[in-house]
């Protein structure tokens, strides 16, 4: 989706744009700093202050929303993967402003590993639930099939019983109401 520099994407007239919409807005406004696709670049430490100052007159994005957006952006797998030791950090206009040190690179690698582990655990739990539901459904279908087979083998007595009861009931009701009407 292409975003014009001074406009936020229209999200069905929402008053608060989503994090993704703001990231798209920032990528359009500061293309040398933020990206939506491809490899991300490590951001300057303290970039949030620079960003808040640069967007101070922008009514579309509040400081709180900027903090949420930066948190989301910097916790993405794409961003964490780019934070390698000695990688260049960049400012809003794409200028080099420092490097990622060993401790920061290790923290990013650990955060990425934890995020991937949590994702794998959620996926495994979802697969477990899907398997459980599948086998419950299969067992239910097998029980129903066995019940139907038993009914067919016995000559479907339930259907005959219901039919006789219905015919007898109708005969009684007809007799009862026909006497009263005559």
From Swiss-Prot:
Protein name, as recorded: RNA chaperone ProQ
NCBIfam families (alphabetical): PRK04950.1
Highest taxon above the source species: Bacteria
GO-annotated cellular components: cytosol
MF-aspect GO terms: RNA strand annealing activity; RNA strand-exchange activity
Keyword Chaperone on entry: yes
Gene3D superfamilies reported for this sequence: ProQ/FinO domain
HAMAP family recorded: ProQ (MF_00749)
Location, primary (coarse class): cytoplasm
Keywords: Chaperone, Cytoplasm, RNA-binding
Role summary: RNA chaperone with significant RNA binding, RNA strand exchange and RNA duplexing activities.
Native source species: Haemophilus ducreyi (strain 35000HP / ATCC 700724)
Example of a GO biological process term: post-transcriptional regulation of gene expression
Localization annotation: Cytoplasm
Similarity field: Belongs to the ProQ family.
Xref: InterPro entries: ProQ, ProQ/FinO, ProQ/FinO_sf
